[in-house]
Amino acid sequence: MNFNNLDFAAAILNVSLLWILTVPHEFAHAWVATLLGDDTPRREGRLTLYPLAHIDWIGTTLLPAITSLFGGGFIGWGKPVNTNPSKLRWGAKGLALVALAGPASNVVLAVILAGAALLAVRLVPAFSEYAARGVRLSLYLAIFNMLPVPPLDGSKLLLSAKVPYAVYAELARFGLILLLVLLTATSLGRWMSLWSYQATEQIFRTLHG
């Protein structure tokens, strides 16, 4: 193995950005679930912006660091927010809204970061570049989290669509392996990266006028 080819800068940047982006993402799940009548996130301490409440040490640190180091795509997620579907207003539709809240927050964050990057481009170029990277990563996470594979948000849409729980449980058993296969042995990872770059460019063009 040639350790000279390891991208330590990408690993540090991606993990630090993932920590920043994970907090509002998971908080959005907790907040929407609470609005819809489920007190589970509040009781479990997830209705907070405290970072460590939402960090999954494997999904938010270890895996993204490894995949960034070796340049093999990007895999990362936060600590899943537990919900009780029986307490949610509107039942399956409520569960779908909770699931969509996280990716939606990533899109909102991408727009905010893009605005910050444009404002800082002359005053603090280094921050502008960091924020622009955050835009791309936030949009990537929005679409990545929609994959219907546990523990990602898209898998909750399977439950809201009344997919048998036994099927969901089987997916959950092999979720990590399935994600690794999808992102390394297919063109899915490259497609998501391309989409996030194109969406980022579109946001910057729109904001810049």
Q: Each PLM stretch: what is its role?
A:
Residues 1-209:
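Hydrophobic transmembrane alpha-helices and their immediate loop junctions
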